[in-house]
Every structure is written in structure tokens, then in C-alpha cells.
Amino acid sequence: LGSSLVGSLYILDEPSIGLHSRDTDRLIHVLKELQALGNTVVVVEHDEEIMRAADYLIDVGPDAGRLGGEIVFEGKVSDIKRIEGDINDKNNAESKQLLEKYPRSYTIKYLTGAEFIEVPKSRRPWNMAIELKGARMNNLKGVDVKFPLNVFTVVTGVSGSGKSSLVKGILYPALKRHLDEVADTPGEYSSLGGDWKQIKHVEFV
């Protein structure tokens, strides 16, 4: 993408997969630079930041499989405005009209804020955890970390920081072997302790 070609059509298929928000910003900057040089950029994507940075949006749906395959929205991203307060307020007239015109577009519903993912009012407490110590693989520098049991945990960080090495490269195969299951050789680690015996099976999806 760093080339200076002009008059080209660049097609990218979900380039944001695996990217941290910081890296997504950098990707958007590169795509904008390509466009500024006189190129056409077409991106297959569902990342909100990239959709909002685009000039034009084509939404395919309304659902997956045999329930999809139709264009449920096509238009300028600048026409998609977030709802502020009551949807019936005059300030939200454009958003209301857009929702009425394209009722089958889930993308428009979320970009306008008509639908949203609610943040839980409370978090599930935990008192058991798997403790991984001295994890060393690729960019990991002998880290110690706890993975709480019976809760929803997210491992995050910028691209290349060591997330996959920690989870896929060490935790997963190490735990499989502790459970006497066949697994690849894990990355280096000092110990796997805590309440790992509470785990009966390990699945990598």
C-alpha cells in the first residue's frame, strides 16, 4: 500500500482484522493517501472507524446466507448522522428519514445510534484463575498473567505486541498438555498454576 501508483483500483478484504485501534487509524491514513493520489479504494469491512472514514457506503444484507444478497443501503457516509436525544426531535429529522428509507440495514441502525450494544451494569465477580508465569515467546518478555475463570476476558494490545503468542502460542498448548491432550509444543514459560484443574476441556476456535 505504500506505493505511489496513480489511477489504480485498490481492493482490500477486511484489512482491519487483528488490528488495534491505533493501527486502524494508521490504515485509514494510508487509504486516504491512496485516494488523494487519484486512486479508487474499495474495502470490504465492518469496522466502524473505517466505515465512518469512507466517502461512500454500500451495505449488503439484510442477513446472512439465503437471507442476504441484497443491497439494503447505498449512499454517502456524510448523510449518516448520529441520533442525539429523542429520535423525534427536529435535529434528528435526517436520521429518522434515513432509517425509514432503509429499514432493513442493520449498519445504518448502528451508525445512527438507533440500535447499540449495551454496556453491562455490573461485572461478574471471580475468585479462581489460571496463573501463567514467565511467558517468553516472540515479543513476550517473561510476563506473568492471570486468566480469571468463569468470566469473559479480552486480551488486547497493538498489532505485534504478543497477544497471539500469549494465548495461542503458550496458554492453549500448555493447558492442553496439562490435561494430557495432544498439542503442539508451547512457547517457553516458567509455570502454569492456579486453578487450571477446574478446566475439563480446551477449545481453540
Which residue stretches match the model-derived regions?
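Conserved phosphate-binding elements of NTP-dependent enzyme cores
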Residues: 1-205
